[in-house]
Amino acid sequence: MDKTKALEGALSQIERAFGKGSIMRMGQRPKVETNVISTGSIGLDIALGIGGMPRGRIVEIYGPESSGKTTLALHVLAEAQKKGGTVAFIDAEHALDPGYARKLGVNIDDLLLSQPDAGEQALEIADTLVRSGAVDVLVVDSVAALVPRAELEGDMGDSHVGLHARLMSQALRKLTGTVSRSNTLVIFLNQIRMKIGVMFGNPETTTGGNALKFYSSIRLDIRRIGSIKDKDEVVGNQTRVKVVKNKMAPPFRQVEFDIMYGEGISKMGELLDLGVKGNIVEKSGAWFSFDSQRIGQGRENAKQFLREHPEMASEIERRIRAEAGVLSDALMTDPEPDADGTPED
């Protein structure tokens, strides 16, 4: 039998059974430009290589406690709302601070919030929201707090080996197809644990088994690397984000920015740092200059000057975005072990 006829027969049979478009040649597939949502950080948008977080994909953000995971996720929600999107937050940790979210630019009145009792309930709500196709961004905070119902109903000393990992694996198998079809960005926040008895390599691992590592298109490792002080008072954290996995662009880029208390990611700080990296802003000693005009002695003074002169800040931002290709190469780092002690694939 002729192979071409056999193939056409098989294709038409598949289309009759599963609907038009269920199978097609790659060349026939409509080319869709990656639709992204900004992270709220110019540097991280550049480091991701596509200008933000991709819709229709699963993203994992992990790191130690108080490293900025929820802050980064809330910035993404705020950016999606600015574009007129619908956003949801599944607060499994029951720890969302509405006042802080509002300060970061999130419209609390339109935010869909769920505080589920058990892991199964949280993931069922997530699946229903994604299937609706009406939600643009969904954040689950956090994987570690998705406690299986059997564990909640059992006694304190009971052993529940592998229940959490099985729950995550099952949920992600269901979610991954609907996430792609509905074009929803799903962000899982995750915590770090230490593996016992690791002599060599990185003892850190993330909770919830291995499924999320495989299903995530992007994995971000976020760490607090220092404190920002105003005289003796701590007013913020210096934060480093490393792209440990990226299916959309080259991984292993990292970016540093300031997270200021009550303000979130410091845009002015990023403009200075990226401006210096891209030779857009000149730094001579402690002085910062732009187009031969001095803008401040010391980083905090220069940041304040840019806040007071938004037209200059927007011009620096425009030039930084124009130099995104050059800057993304400057953000490249060597592959390092991720939270499992192995380089990401």
Swiss-Prot record:
Keyword Cell division: no
Source organism of the structure: Gluconobacter oxydans (strain 621H)
Superkingdom of origin organism: Bacteria
Biased composition range(s): Acidic residues: 335-345
Keyword ATP-binding: yes
Lineage of the organism: Bacteria, Pseudomonadati, Pseudomonadota, Alphaproteobacteria, Acetobacterales
Xref: Gene3D superfamilies: P-loop containing nucleotide triphosphate hydrolases
One GO MF term: damaged DNA binding
Primary residence: cytoplasm
Chain spans, region Disordered: 326-345
Protein name, per record: Protein RecA
